[in-house]
């Protein structure tokens, strides 16, 4: 992996199974681009491609050729990879009965460390196709999404996307990957929530347009409210709280809190940086979940004041958890601990003349037009939050120090009235 990164051989927009990358960083980048485009009055179409059993259909000869000619692997290293891929067998066993042994002629070994990496290298030529057509894209292992901002005044605005899809299908067929048209989904975003569906040619994608899609575990709606996602989180969290009530009598408070974090908090925090700037009504539903979990853990009654309970548990409220995640991504981006595609969204503030502000580690805040569009984009919201932090937090020397200082600061903001 170090060789691939140092040699700039890995796809920059492939976020699967790479250090400092995650589903969240991938979605932050994609949603940033879409929010900025719609903030500028454009429409944007997002397409989620489906590859059926992609890991199982990799052609070994093509993969070896790719490793040799695209990645530059040769000699003993290439021979070792050949021995790893070829002459593999499998059988099916049920109880004491088993099938005859059969050769595995295709696919990368699943469940292995090398499998996902080899698959991502197998997909390397896809990036050139997307770039040829000028279509932004992002990959997470075998999850592939491409999106295109466009203006209604453009001539044939969706033509680059449609031509790109044609080439992608041809490439996949040539490389023994099964492109599943029926499971491919598309969603259209407008400049505002009430935007009408534009009269543009989406060809076969028209029948696959949805008002809401699930992208890397996050439900995204065409109005960008994230209401569908929040509703799903709330429903799932309360379901698990009800289930936990059955085991609560058998767990210590410490163990119960760990279980709550595993089943409830993890859902509240998953990709929560995408929720920066959403409406208070949306966040309040998530806050109800956290409040219920806090009362469940402490045995407090439904109508007991929640703020002292959260303070005693040292649980930051939902809105502060969202800000915390965004600022953590900023700190990591500024310290080479995040994907390059996120770091590129942040620019240092350059004062017009020599001022003390040059030493404040401030970021430039791009101008935006709409509170519910541009202001929510990572490239806008993140610098605004960062610049409002006290200097000693921005000057933190490591991730643990930054997280500790930031939590202490947010704790004081969230619970400053507790105990007064």
Per-region residue spans from a language model:
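Hydrophobic/basic alpha-helical segments
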Residues: 1-420
């Amino acid at each position: 992996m170090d060789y691939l990164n140092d040699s700039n051989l890995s796809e920059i927009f492939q976020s699967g199974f790479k250090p400092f990358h995650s589903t969240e960083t991938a979605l932050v980048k994609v949603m940033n681009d879409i929010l900025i485009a719609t903030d500028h009055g454009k429409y944007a179409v997002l397409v989620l491609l489906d590859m059926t059993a992609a890991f199982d259909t990799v052609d070994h000869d093509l993969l070896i050729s790719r490793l040799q000619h695209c990645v530059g692997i040769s000699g003993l290293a290439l021979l070792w990879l050949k021995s790893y891929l070829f002459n593999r067998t499998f059988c099916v066993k049920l109880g004491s009965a088993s099938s005859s042994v059969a050769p595995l002629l295709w696919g990368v070994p699943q469940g292995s460390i090398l499998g996902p990496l080899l698959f991502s290298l197998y997909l390397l030529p896809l990036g050139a196709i997307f770039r040829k057509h000028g279509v932004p894209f992002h990959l997470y292992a075998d999850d592939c999404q491409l999106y295109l901002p466009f203006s209604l005044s453009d001539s044939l605005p969706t033509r680059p996307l449609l031509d790109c899809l044609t080439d992608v299908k041809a490439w996949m067929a040539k490389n023994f990957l099964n492109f599943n048209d029926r499971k491919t989904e598309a969603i259209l975003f407008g400049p505002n929530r009430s935007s009408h569906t534009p009269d543009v040619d989406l060809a076969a994608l028209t029948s696959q347009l949805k008002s809401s899609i699930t992208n890397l575990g996050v439900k995204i709606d065409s109005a960008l409210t994230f209401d569908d996602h929040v509703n799903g989180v709330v429903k799932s969290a309360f379901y698990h709280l009800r289930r936990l009530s059955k085991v609560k009598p058998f767990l210590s408070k410490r163990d119960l809190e760990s279980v709550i974090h595993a089943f409830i908090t993890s859902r509240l925090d998953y990709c929560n940086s995408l929720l920066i700037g959403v409406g208070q009504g949306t966040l309040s539903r998530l806050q109800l979940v956290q409040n219920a979990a806090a009362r469940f853990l402490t045995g407090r009654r439904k109508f007991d004041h929640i703020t002292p309970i959260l303070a005693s548990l040292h649980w930051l409220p939902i809105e502060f958890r969202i800000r915390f995640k965004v600022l953590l991504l900023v700190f990591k981006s500024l310290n080479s601990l995040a994907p390059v595609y996120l770091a590129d969204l942040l620019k240092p503030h350059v004062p017009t003349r020599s001022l003390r502000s040059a030493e404040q580690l401030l970021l430039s805040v791009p101008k935006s037009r709409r509170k519910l569009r541009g202001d929510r984009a990572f490239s806008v919201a993140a610098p605004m939050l960062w610049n409002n932090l006290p200097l000693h937090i921005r000057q933190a020397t490591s991730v643990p120090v930054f997280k500790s200082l930031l939590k202490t600061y947010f704790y004081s903001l969230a619970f400053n009235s507790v105990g007064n």
